[in-house]
A protein has these predicted regions:
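Conserved P-loop
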Residues: 1-75, 116-127, 140, 152, ...
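Structural motif
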Residues: 4, 85-87, 109
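Residues at the starts of beta-strands that form the adenosine-phosphate
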Residues: 29-30, 107, 134
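Walker B catalytic acidic pair
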Residues: 89-91, 112
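Catalytic P-loop NTPase motifs of RecA-like helicase/translocase cores
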Residues: 92-96, 117
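Sensor-1/coupling segment of RecA-like P-loop NTPase cores
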Residues: 102-124
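Conserved AAA+ ATPase "SRH/arginine-finger" region at the nucleotide-binding site
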Residues: 134-143
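Short, cysteine/histidine-rich loop/knuckle motifs that typically chelate Zn2+
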Residues: 144-147, 176
Length: 192
């Protein structure tokens, strides 16, 4: 089974991944967590309290890999290593993560943003969506008005900037506040 857990920042994607990961460890399954090399936040979820290094050290069925990208041979190697389930945190930052979809030897849970600040799907999102048996879309909370159904915005920053997970320039906004921010950004750009 292939599952995608997506949503805006601060919606609980990594926490949802971890809850599922814990269940598999409790069931004594062999679990692999793949994290992107680009993610240097130093924590797994905003809610804290999760020490992945300690969990890996104390559990012989749990392995963490930090990867820059994934190719087809990596996906096959994971199958050969006997993993029952693979979790990919911030999948959109790992080119080739979609290769994991082509293996039937293990279940895969992808977690991360669905789209960029302009609501354009990430290339990896486009490649994994057709293979996902389940898609769980989580909602965030708008940092401006507090409503649910978050969207994405770089506020006053240039779209050309790369998204860095946990970046303070990245905001979770509802559709109304997102449109207002886009309008304000346009006015500021015209004033320059």
């Amino acid at each position: 089974m292939k599952t995608l857990i997506c949503g805006p920042m601060y919606s609980g994607k990594s926490t949802a991944l971890f809850q599922r990961l814990e269940r598999f460890l409790f069931a004594k399954k062999k679990v692999l967590l793949i994290r992107p090399k680009k993610d240097d936040r130093g924590y797994f979820t905003h809610s804290g309290g999760i020490d992945l290094d300690k969990l890996e050290k104390n559990n012989p069925n749990f392995v963490i890999l930090t990867l820059k990208d994934i190719d087809e041979s990596d996906a096959k190697s994971i199958a050969n290593d006997g993993f029952d389930v693979v979790f990919v945190d911030e999948y959109f930052m790992i080119p080739g993560a979609h290769h994991l979809c082509h293996q039937d030897d293990y279940d895969v849970y992808f977690g991360g943003l669905l789209a960029d600040s302009e609501s354009e799907l990430f290339p990896e999102t486009i490649k994994i969506l057709p293979y996902c048996d389940k898609i769980k879309k989580l909602n965030g909370v708008c940092i401006k008005c507090g409503s649910e159904l978050g969207n994405y915005s770089f506020a006053a920053f240039d779209k050309k900037e790369k998204i860095v997970v946990g970046d303070t320039k990245y905001e979770c906004l509802c559709h109304k506040c997102y449109k207002e921010a886009q309008h304000e950004k346009k006015i500021n750009k015209e004033a320059e």
